[in-house]
Regions:
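Solvent-exposed, low-complexity segments and loops of surface/extracellular structural proteins
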Residues: 8, 155-157, 179-181
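Long, well-ordered mid-to-C-terminal structural blocks that present hydrophobic/aromatic surfaces
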Residues: 213-251
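Flexible, surface-exposed loop regions and adjacent strand-edge segments
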Residues: 63, 127-131, 191, 248-254, ...
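Beta-barrel outer-membrane channel/assembly domains of diderm bacteria
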Residues: 8-9, 17, 21-118, 122-125, ...
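Solvent-exposed loop segments that connect transmembrane elements
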Residues: 243-266, 299-302
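Flexible, solvent-exposed coil segments and beta strand-coil junctions
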Residues: 116-123, 172-175, 252-262
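Outer-membrane beta-barrel signature, preferentially recognizing the C-terminal barrel domain
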Residues: 132, 162, 265-275
Length: 342
């Protein structure tokens, strides 16, 4: 009788222990699941697709589409590109991937691959129109100190052989931006100064830059808001320095390195200068801009004329249609673009 009671008690105790273990495991699973669901629910994602159609030769068009998916979650940012060409080929690539964290309230530390842009974009800038990506792998520490925004970091991973510091601020209508880069002891810099007056209707700008290879750039500009939707602008840009005449300004991390394919005027060479002037008209859903460039040699007679015409139409909240045309002397280049965002 004692053995039966002892066996029964052991069986009951074992059953209760197993039941408690199962309940504990189930609770842990539920907690983890709830945390995962909460994390996913709090994540923000977006998607966009841009199509470029080269319409220069209407009998032989070509083009490609880039689709980008972006995910932001708890300080983590991941963005990837998928490319589809009209010839049927496809490819994929990582656009951005970084993690950001607050540093005891002093600033923000970011590690990973980023698409950076500083000041006027002479040395470091993103592509706002074209398909090229200008990303760097490294770390960035940003902070604000008495109205001055400071970024300092590396562009060659976590090693310090390629590093930069950028400072920017705005005071009483005056804006400044100073960027200095040290690329394995090759030191480049760019300084931007802007002044706004007449309640922001008249804006003056001045930029000085050195690519670290003895080619220097100077640009002066003015922009004026004729009325709410119409503005006119003009710039004079000159390249000079101790480098050999014909040496192109070196800025591989700037969209100006590719120029027209990224929708901007490209960097020129030592001994060249450009006069640019144009207008832009924005009605909200419809936007139009037209700019003329004249490129000449400082000590020569050679001249090249560029014209840049851009037209865009906001079809709906998610889709924008665009048309862009360049004319270089007597040669025309035209593109049709379609942008979709979610």
């Amino acid at each position: 009788g004692h053995e039966i009671r002892y066996t029964y008690i052991c069986h009951v105790l074992t059953k209760n222990i197993n039941l408690k273990i199962m309940k504990k495991n189930l609770r842990n699973v539920l907690v983890l699941s709830l945390g995962l669901i909460t994390t996913i629910a709090s994540a923000q994602w977006s998607a966009s697709s841009n199509t470029w159609i080269d319409n220069t030769n209407s009998d032989d068009r070509s083009g490609f589409t880039r689709s980008t998916v972006t995910l932001d979650m708890s300080g983590v940012h991941i963005s990837g590109d998928h490319y589809w060409n009209t010839d049927g080929t496809t490819s994929q690539g990582l656009y951005e991937a970084y993690v950001s964290s607050d540093v005891m309230g002093f600033g923000t530390l970011t590690l990973g691959r980023q698409d950076l842009s500083f000041g006027s974009g002479v040395l470091v800038s993103s592509s706002n129109w074209g398909a090229n990506r200008y990303t760097t792998d490294g770390m960035d520490f940003s902070m604000s100190l008495s109205g001055i925004n400071i970024n300092a970091g590396t562009m060659g991973g976590i090693n310090t052989d390629v590093n930069y510091i950028n400072a920017s601020g705005e005071f009483a209508g005056v804006s400044i931006n100073a960027l200095m880069i040290d690329n394995q002891d090759v030191k480049s810099n760019a300084y931007d100064l802007g002044y706004s007056m007449m309640n922001g209707d008249l804006n003056l700008s001045y930029t000085m830059a050195d690519d670290g290879y003895d080619t220097e750039m100077t640009r002066m500009g003015v922009a004026y808001n004729v009325f709410e939707n119409l503005s006119v602008h003009g710039h004079m840009t000159q390249y000079e320095g101790e480098s050999a005449v014909g040496t192109v300004f070196n800025a591989p991390m700037s969209s100006m390195s590719e120029g027209l394919s990224d929708g901007v005027m490209p960097h020129l060479a030592n001994g060249q200068e450009a006069m640019s002037y144009g207008l832009s008209y924005d009605l909200g859903d419809i936007a139009f801009s037209y700019t003329m460039h004249n490129v000449s040699e400082t000590d020569g007679d050679a001249e090249v004329d560029y014209t840049d015409l851009s037209l865009s139409y906001q079809l709906n909240d998610n889709c924008t249609l665009g048309y862009r045309s360049w004319k270089i002397d007597d040669t025309d280049y035209t593109f049709i673009t379609v942008g979709i965002g979610l």
